[in-house]
Amino acid sequence: TTQSGNTVIKTLNWMPHIGMNFDLYLDGLSILFSLLITGIGSLVVLYSIGYLSKSEQLGNFYCYLLLFMGAMLGVVLSDNLIILYLFWELTSFSSFLLISFWREKKASIYGAQKSLIITVLGGLSLLGGIILLSLAAHTFSIQTMIEKVSDIQNSPFFILAMVLVMIGAFTKSAQVPFYIWLPDAMEAPTPVSAYLHSATMVKAGLYLIARMTPIFAISEGWVWTITLVGLVTLFWASLNATKQQDLKGILAFSTVSQLGMIMSMLGIGAVSYHYNGTDSQVYVAGFIAAIFHLINHATFKGALFMITGGVDHSTGTRDVRKLGGLLTIMPISFTITVITALSM
């Protein structure tokens, strides 16, 4: 159905008298993210079976992981913005539980608290934007808002709503200056880093930008802000990655830089709303490139994180100054690392 451009909408009544229902909206974008969430999530679950010790609280770990997976699916499938926000905050809560899984490590607790504070505050910003949008469009439905986009653009709340939504997206996807939570979150178990911080949670902000672009792209402020913030994030994080000596630290800043690249591509794609014909198609290529690299990054960066976990288990260190000669002792991992690194 979605291959032919059609969409699937399913409504589950919850509080219809105030316009809050579970409106599930399935199109190409939501299917793509759903496949990433469930596909890579399944691989991470299989990986964690061998990675985590049987003496650890595996039941709790899998419960937290599946809770996060369900929350992410709720984010990408919700058409009602209030429901999307509830799932959005649930991803922050479940990620806190996962990052702090090794509670005996103070660094894990600190990283989890930092992540929770920044992403929850960003979520509150998003909630403010949602409320202002609902005042302008008299609905919480994203698709209905797109149909009423002229009313929203003429509303006095338009600019403020746009800024608040962008802040919510930037905090979740670790854009400058909100990226500071992601490196500290690397104290989580490697399966968590592979899943949350390369394939899913950090992609939620990118999903929100892509989903809300039809509403806000008419504003040059939306286009320029997304593009410039993405480019600044790309270069700043790339520079910081070269200074790291911990493998996960390198991957953390590399992830931030790639998120910035995808964000800037979405900004370039949003320019298509200002042109018609051939000129529009040129900028649409930015959207296509963003989605392609989103899939590419989620797949191969997740693999790099899991290989890093294998190196840590085998050698007892992630310090690149102490690692050498891994080709002879881990030839398969070396080959996979080269392939996945080249994809970046």
Where are these regions (language model features)?
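...captures the hydrophobic TM-helix bundle architecture rather than a specific catalytic motif
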Residues: 1-344
